């Protein structure tokens, strides 16, 4: 569900910043109560905020990945220390790992296709 303009913008932003960044990865931000090892990691359990008041957590979507060849060969990873994170809209960040996610993506695709007629 990635838009053409997002691909173009990613390429242009990375190209303009080759002196600063080795790679670009698309990301989305979420305000969710996150836990690890049975403990909250982004809030105090004694003072649980509403989710809309949480600091957004960034998640790579890997919809678009751009990396300098030299950096990729050196790190063997598209996410480098000098990575440009490009935020995409939630509907562009849909991941398809199972049937339910495929059904959601198909529904959204058809909805956006019909809206753009």
Language model regions located:
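Hydrophobic helical membrane-anchoring modules
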Residues: 74, 86-87, 91-117
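Conserved core of the sugar-phosphate nucleotidyltransferase
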Residues: 1-89
């Amino acid at each position: 569900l990635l838009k053409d303009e997002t691909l173009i913008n990613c390429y242009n932003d990375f190209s303009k910043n080759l002196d600063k960044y080795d790679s670009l990865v698309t990301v989305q931000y979420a305000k969710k109560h996150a836990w690890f090892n049975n403990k909250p990691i982004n809030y105090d359990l004694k003072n649980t905020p509403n989710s809309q008041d949480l600091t957004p957590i960034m998640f790579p979507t890997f919809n678009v990945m751009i990396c300098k060849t030299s950096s990729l060969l050196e790190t063997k990873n598209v996410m480098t220390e000098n990575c440009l994170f490009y935020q995409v809209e939630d509907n562009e960040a849909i991941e398809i790992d199972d049937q339910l996610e495929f059904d959601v993506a198909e529904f959204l695709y058809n909805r956006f296709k019909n809206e753009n007629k």
